[in-house]
Amino acid sequence: MDKLSLMHLEGLPIKGDSVFCDITMQDESLKITETSGIFKKKAKNTFSLDLNKIISMDIINEKNIQEKQKSIVGRGIAGAVLFGPAGAIVGGLSGTGKKQKIKTKNVFVISYYGKDNEVKSINFDPGLVIAFVEEFIRDYEDKCGKNQQVNEHGEIEL
C-alpha cells in the first residue's frame, strides 16, 4: 500500500474541517497532498516529509495508549511530546467515569522531527480503512527498517 486518502485532524497548516489528504510513500519522502472535490480530486497544497525525519507511524486509541503506558518504552511514546494533540483527542475518551460503551476513536499519527529537531505530529482519521492504514505502516517499517522487537518487559531489543 503506497497511497492513502484520509481526513486531516491536526498537524498541517490546513484551514477547514473534514479536509482530505492523499498520503503517498515515495523513495525518500512522504508526500501529503491536500485535496478538494469528491469525484474529481483537485490538489491544493502539497507537503513533503523526509522518511529519515519520521520517528514513528502508529494508530493510537484509548486501549493502546494504556498498554504503552504500562511499558518502560511506552511511557515516553504515549506522552503528549510524541503524539501531540492526538493524545488529548484519544485521552478525552478515557476521562468518563461512567460504565458505558464508548465507540473507540482511532487516530493515525505520524511523529517526526521538525525544524531544529523539535518533535511534531500529523494526525489523520483512519475512518473505515484502518486495515489499509495498518498495511501502509507495515510497508513504511519494512522500507525504513523500523521494525523493532520488544521483549516481554516492554524493552526494545537492539
Describe each model-derived feature in a short phrase.
Residues 2, 17, 22, 27, ...:
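Acidic-enriched, low-complexity/disordered segments with a strong bias for Aspartate over Glutamate
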Residues 40-52, 118-127:
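Short amphipathic beta-strand/extended segments with alternating polar/hydrophobic composition
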Residues 57-158:
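Acidic, Ser/Thr- and proline-rich intrinsically disordered linker/docking segments
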Residues 30, 46-65:
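Phosphoinositide-dependent membrane-docking surfaces
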Residues 1-7, 12, 51, 78-86, ...:
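Generic detector of solvent-exposed, compositionally biased contiguous segments
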Residues 1-47:
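Anionic N-terminal interaction surfaces
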